[in-house]
Curated annotation (Swiss-Prot):
Gene Ontology terms describing biological process: oxaloacetate metabolic process
Cofactor annotation: Mg(2+)
Keyword list, A-Z: Lyase, Magnesium, Metal-binding
Cofactor note: Binds 1 Mg(2+) ion per subunit.
Function recorded in the entry: May play a role in fatty acid biosynthesis.
Official protein name in the record: Citrate lyase subunit beta-like protein
Single Gene Ontology MF annotation: lyase activity
Quaternary organization: Homotrimer.
Organism of derivation: Deinococcus radiodurans (strain ATCC 13939 / DSM 20539 / JCM 16871 / CCUG 27074 / LMG 4051 / NBRC 15346 / NCIMB 9279 / VKM B-1422 / R1)
Enzyme class (EC, first level): lyase
Positions with a binding annotation for substrate: R74, E129
Top-level taxon in the UniProt lineage: Bacteria
Length: 284
């Protein structure tokens, strides 16, 4: 298996029927890429069937050409007529499989079992994109094979019969619930797609909100979004330097027998130290 890094700040998608675009995925230096057999491929049996060998071969070539890159395939939803045939595209060399529109923990367990039966012990990136999926987010993420989850705002809003607005108030509750469930289960949460492709300020504002809600990375649908995602997700070198200095100060205080100490004008407590340790753990 091509193991993904501990932190996925950016996950860049490409259509599974476009080998030319898949080959270009590493150019923008995302942390992970997804070869998409679901939304990016027309919803006909003929189109899905034609995309599978393209996606399979493109994934193989991408893994060989960019061994540092985490490569995923997104299959169609479990209860779609395409799901089982999509499994033929998967190989053990992938970093994981993206399963959209999961709605119950039992569905995630069923997917994991089907993968195991095919000798494909791949971790799952679970898509929570419906009212039921958000409602049952925690039980889905408690399935051991689920390592990451993403919130899909567009499908969620459609499922509820709502409407997307520039401010995103209509998805704030669900977006927060997915982030909370991820925190409680130790799963990494990936934030929503920004469909405005030529509007970096809109992307930045959305990424800033996602980071504030607790998301650790962002789904990207254009190469230009990758660098923007990296601005907001994951520690900067300044963040790392400050964390190291804080832990050094804590060690020095402990040597002096001081349980409490201040750092840069702030009293330090254990949650601050834990946050610094977590930040530096992503360097591994």
């Amino acid at each position: 298996m091509n193991a993904p890094p501990a932190l996925l700040r950016s996950v860049l998608f490409a259509p599974g029927n476009r080998a030319d675009l898949i080959a270009k995925l590493p150019r923008s230096a995302p942390d992970a890429v997804v070869i998409d057999l679901e939304d990016a491929v027309p919803g006909t049996a003929e189109a899905k069937a034609a995309a599978r060998p393209v996606a399979h071969d493109a994934a193989r070539d991408l893994i060989a050409a960019a061994p540092h890159l985490a490569v995923f395939v997104r299959v169609n939803a479990l209860h779609s007529p395409y799901f089982e045939d999509d499994l033929s595209v998967l190989t053990p060399e992938l970093s994981g499989v993206v399963v959209p529109k999961l709605e119950m923990g039992a569905e995630a367990r069923q997917v994991a079992q089907m993968l195991q039966e095919r000798s494909l012990p791949l971790p799952i990136l679970a898509g929570l994109e419906t009212g039921a999926g958000v409602w049952n987010a925690r039980e889905i993420m408690e399935v051991p094979e689920v390592a990451w989850a993403y919130f899909g705002a567009e499908d969620y809003t459609t499922d509820l019969g709502g409407k997307r607005t520039p401010g995103g108030l209509e998805v704030l509750y669900a977006r927060s619930q997915v982030a909370l469930a991820a925190r409680l289960t130790g799963v990494a949460a990936l934030d929503i797609v920004v469909t405005a492709l030529n509007d970096p300020e809109t992307f930045r504002a959305d990424a800033e909100q996602g980071r504030a809600l607790g998301y650790s990375g962002k789904l990207c649908i254009h190469p230009a979004q990758v660098a923007l995602a990296h601005e907001y997700f994951g520690p900067t070198e300044a963040d790392r330097a400050r964390a190291r200095a804080l832990l050094d100060a804590a060690a020095a205080a402990a040597q002096r027998g001081h349980g409490a100490f201040s750092f840069e004008g702030q009293m330090v407590d254990e949650p601050m130290l834990a946050k610094a340790r977590t930040l530096l753990s992503h360097e591994a």
